[in-house]
Amino acid sequence: MPATARWTARKIGLDGFTPGQINELDTNILIGASYLKLALDEFRGSMPLAAAAYNAGPNRPRAWRNGPTLEAAIWAETIPYGETRDYVKKVLSNTTDYAALLSGRPQSLKSRLGSVGPAPVDEPVLTKDLP
């Protein structure tokens, strides 16, 4: 998404960014990883919400989290968009698998991902302009 790439480049201080640079491997990885970090910050480290925001934009998971508090793996099944639901499940599964490989210890999906529920009313939005 060119607009998201431009926004992220500005946010991280990548001076002189042009949309064509998104095709450069190093720039693409930098912008993608930076956007994911901004989404993680926005959603207070919630990997399921950040993955959903990365795929569907941040406004959708902001709305989707307003139901009952659920285990993240169960919450992912409630995502109304099939593409985003599948994306989030794959990201969460792969994150857990790679964490196990890197640590040499089995990982619990439930303990790594926590739960998803409504944001606390006093929780400020960090990057309200996150596209």
Q: Model-predicted segments: where are they?
A:
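Catalytic and substrate-binding regions of cell-wall glycan-acting enzymes that process beta-1,4-linked
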Residues: 45-104
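Gram-negative outer-membrane assembly/targeting C-terminal domains
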Residues: 78, 94-131
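Generic structural "secondary-structure junction" signal
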Residues: 2, 24, 63, 77, ...
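Short, contiguous acidic/charged loop-to-helix segments that flank catalytic cores in large enzymes
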Residues: 11-27, 41, 76-82
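Hydrophobic alpha-helical bundle architecture
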Residues: 37-44
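Substrate-binding/active-site groove segments that recognize
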Residues: 1-15, 25-37, 59, 91
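Helical anchoring/docking segments at protein termini
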Residues: 2-3, 7, 21-22, 46, ...
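Short alpha-helix boundary/capping motifs
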Residues: 33, 68, 119-120
